[in-house]
């Protein structure tokens, strides 16, 4: 009888282990469902703040700057100067209208460049930057990169290209604590985003790689040269009509 009881205990897996197993099996499905819901909601709802902005607050507070405040005000796509979207695409992601979230050619070029050493070159598309800035934290871990890829797939699947670009133009950092085209236009030139001139738009696009290092309002030689190059690239792409791309 004692042996039979022992065998029964050995055969039955502990309840706690079974619960953990069920949670481990359900967790990926729950995360996938939650992330899809996030993306579907933000297709139609303008976020009041992004994860990147939250991170900037935490960074400032961590440095003891409790008085830090950021500037951001949402503007719909059609309330932003037509020059800015095409200039941002010319600067950051010229294949944006055509790709589905990832520019494989740019990734290959960046990999070859970085293998030779020197300054590290990135290959993130606008879609990837939106995924990172809106949903995730800053960093270079493989976990974050994997989540970035997942969210990039989702926003390309559920959002039209114009929504992706609209989101980018409203959450991108154009100066220290200055997020989005409207805040940048007000802080730098005391105007609305709709009133940005082509040269002002080009300078905003020019500082995107390092918005805390470069100044769109008082541009140095590098920003001026880059802004001129960006304007030339935008003309070669065909101007704002280029953003229509293939039908989605």
Swiss-Prot record:
One of its GO terms (molecular function) is peptidoglycan glycosyltransferase activity. Its EC number is 2.4.99.28. It is found in: Cell inner membrane. GO terms for cellular component: peptidoglycan-based cell wall; plasma membrane. InterPro entries: Glyco_trans_51 (IPR001264), Lysozyme-like_dom_sf (IPR023346), PBP_transglycosylase (IPR036950), Pep_trsgly (IPR011812). It is a single-pass membrane protein. GO terms for biological process: cell wall organization; peptidoglycan biosynthetic process; regulation of cell shape. The chain crosses the membrane at residues 20-42. Keywords: Cell inner membrane, Cell membrane, Cell shape, Cell wall biogenesis/degradation, Glycosyltransferase, Membrane, Peptidoglycan synthesis, Transferase, Transmembrane, Transmembrane helix. Pathway: Cell wall biogenesis; peptidoglycan biosynthesis. It catalyses: [GlcNAc-(1->4)-Mur2Ac(oyl-L-Ala-gamma-D-Glu-L-Lys-D-Ala-D-Ala)](n)-di-trans,octa-cis-undecaprenyl diphosphate + beta-D-GlcNAc-(1->4)-Mur2Ac(oyl-L-Ala-gamma-D-Glu-L-Lys-D-Ala-D-Ala)-di-trans,octa-cis-undecaprenyl diphosphate = [GlcNAc-(1->4)-Mur2Ac(oyl-L-Ala-gamma-D-Glu-L-Lys-D-Ala-D-Ala)](n+1)-di-trans,octa-cis-undecaprenyl diphosphate + di-trans,octa-cis-undecaprenyl diphosphate + H(+). The keyword Transit peptide does not apply. Pfam families: Transgly. It comes from the Bacteria. PANTHER family: BIOSYNTHETIC PEPTIDOGLYCAN TRANSGLYCOSYLASE, MONOFUNCTIONAL BIOSYNTHETIC PEPTIDOGLYCAN TRANSGLYCOSYLASE. Peptidoglycan polymerase that catalyzes glycan chain elongation from lipid-linked precursors. Belongs to the glycosyltransferase 51 family. HAMAP family: PGT_MtgA. This is Biosynthetic peptidoglycan transglycosylase. It comes from Xanthomonas euvesicatoria pv. vesicatoria (strain 85-10) (Xanthomonas campestris pv. vesicatoria).
């Amino acid at each position: 009888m004692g042996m039979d009881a022992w065998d029964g205990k050995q055969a039955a897996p502990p309840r706690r282990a079974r619960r953990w197993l069920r949670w481990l099996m359900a967790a990926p499905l729950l995360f996938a469902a939650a992330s899809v819901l996030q993306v579907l909601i933000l297709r139609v709802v303008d976020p009041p703040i992004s994860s990147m902005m939250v991170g900037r607050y935490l960074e400032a507070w961590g440095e003891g700057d409790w008085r830090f405040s950021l500037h951001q005000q949402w503007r719909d796509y059609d309330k932003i100067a037509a020059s800015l979207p095409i200039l941002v695409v010319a600067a950051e992601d010229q294949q944006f209208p055509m790709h589905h979230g990832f520019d494989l050619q740019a990734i290959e070029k960046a990999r070859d460049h970085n293998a030779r050493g020197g300054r590290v070159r990135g290959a993130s598309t606008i879609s990837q930057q939106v995924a990172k800035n809106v949903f995730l934290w800053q960093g270079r871990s493989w976990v974050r990169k994997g989540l970035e890829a997942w969210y990039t797939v989702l926003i390309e699947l559920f959002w039209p290209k114009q929504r992706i670009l609209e989101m980018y133009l409203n959450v991108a950092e154009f100066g220290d604590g200055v997020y989005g085209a409207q805040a940048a236009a007000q802080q730098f030139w005391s105007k609305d985003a709709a009133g940005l001139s082509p040269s002002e738009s080009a300078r905003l696009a020019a500082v995107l790689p390092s918005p805390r290092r470069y100044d769109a309002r008082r541009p140095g030689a590098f920003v001026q040269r880059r802004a001129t190059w960006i304007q030339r690239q935008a003309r070669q792409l065909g101007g704002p009509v280029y953003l229509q791309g293939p039908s989605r």
